[in-house]
Amino acid sequence: MSKSALCIGINDYPGTDSDLAGCVNDASDWSALLAQRGYGVRQMFDSEATKATMVQAIGDLIGAARNGDSVVITYSGHGTWAPDTSGDEPDGRDEGLCPYDIGDGNVLLDDELTEIFRLREAGVRVLLIADSCHSGSVTRGDDADLDPGMPRARFLPPSVWADDTQLAPASLSRNGGFGSFSRLGGDLLMAGCRDTEFSWDTRFGGRPNGAFTYYALKTLQQLGPDASYQDWFRAIGNHLPTTRLPQTPQILGSRSARHFPIFE
């Protein structure tokens, strides 16, 4: 059995005035953890992560995997939405990831990722971890780890990268989400928040990180070796949402996939 991972972190968004701070650290942290778990890891940071290179790298990873192999893709950066042109979205919007060159209009839509994921061979396990996007509000959890003066939302409004003609079919009143990512064809999606919420870019002990990534890694260290993804998700829920980090992590996938051992 082969285990492979791609960890993407984008802080720098030229032409948008919407740079982030914690995404490269997120990707580095996921990379270190996955390497410890026996994964061969490729990293893509900032200018390395254009739409073309992301599509190529994800396609190569999925295409090389065989029955029994495990694939993990982590993405930390901005999320966004674009008007749905295929009619498969009830809310009229396709969700998307924001590559480094999003300022040139190069959004990576969920429909495009779906086509890549459909190429996977039977028996390949795929996990997507997305620390990006959304908006919303709820109060509970523990803020003790969070530095003062933070955080910043990981959502890039379509008006930043698309012109009026591209946006005309959909309303600008709502923020982007990743609910449709549950249809990508992977076994599991672990996301930083609900479709109606933001994921937050913040700082812990002076070091920038995504809130979801920080607490996901923190809680994983406290779980036993036989813990499942469902166990992990419940542990993360003890920390998020909070008053200052109003994001509700999500896990999407089949019952059996939720009970897979973590990163096995």
Which residues does each PLM region occupy?
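Cysteine endopeptidase catalytic domains of the caspase/legumain-like
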Residues: 1-264
